[in-house]
Amino acid sequence: MVSIEGRFTEASSLKIGIVAARFNDLITSKLLSGCIDCLTRHGIDTSESSSQLDIAWVPGSFELPLVSQTMAKSGRYQVLITLGAVIRGDTPHFEVVINESSKGIASVSRETGVPIIFGVLTTDTMQQALERAGVKNNLGWNYALQAIEMGSLMKALK
């Protein structure tokens, strides 16, 4: 039996794309900082002149699937990370946005074979979102770790 796993020690060879939503950028900018911190600590060049990391900004989480699809189809990335924050309001808009963005992102990943890490927070309150993107527990770090693992796993499977 062969056991195949992603390796965190092979991160420096990955080309990663991040698609981040501007809506609720108080949250998404913190998630992005967590991602960049993790990627840097794992040997990925995150400087302005980096050829290993590209960041695309979209208006909101609803637009994440389209830009993810374009990036995945470009053939330049081994893995993508999507970042967004959808906070429940008084209307059903929350359900529409999160349902369509999650289905769209999953569909793009399956269609293209490029792993896409789903880093879209879905919370009832801004406070809950801040707690998930804060200093003590920034899920952006976790999303970057998942990206490293999946990117290296997919390379190992090919």
Swiss-Prot record:
Swiss-Prot/TrEMBL GO biological process terms: riboflavin biosynthetic process
GO CC, alphabetical: cytosol; riboflavin synthase complex
Enzyme Commission designation: 2.5.1.78
Reactions the enzyme catalyzes: (2S)-2-hydroxy-3-oxobutyl phosphate + 5-amino-6-(D-ribitylamino)uracil = 6,7-dimethyl-8-(1-D-ribityl)lumazine + phosphate + 2 H2O + H(+)
Keywords: Riboflavin biosynthesis, Transferase
Annotated SUPFAM superfamilies: Lumazine synthase
Catalytic residues (positions): 93
Residues engaged in binding 5-amino-6-(D-ribitylamino)uracil: 23, 61-63, 85-87, 118
One Gene Ontology molecular-function label: 6,7-dimethyl-8-ribityllumazine synthase activity
Pfam family, one: DMRL_synthase
Residues annotated for (2S)-2-hydroxy-3-oxobutyl phosphate binding in this entry: 90-91, 132
Signal peptide start-end: none
Enzyme class: transferase
Highest taxon of source: Bacteria
Pathway as given in its UniProt record: Cofactor biosynthesis; riboflavin biosynthesis; riboflavin from 2-hydroxy-3-oxobutyl phosphate and 5-amino-6-(D-ribitylamino)uracil: step 1/2
Biological function: Catalyzes the formation of 6,7-dimethyl-8-ribityllumazine by condensation of 5-amino-6-(D-ribitylamino)uracil with 3,4-dihydroxy-2-butanone 4-phosphate. This is the penultimate step in the biosynthesis of riboflavin.
UniProt record similarity statement: Belongs to the DMRL synthase family.
Database matches in HAMAP family: Lumazine_synth (MF_00178)
Protein name: 6,7-dimethyl-8-ribityllumazine synthase
Species whose genome carries this gene: Prochlorococcus marinus (strain SARG / CCMP1375 / SS120)
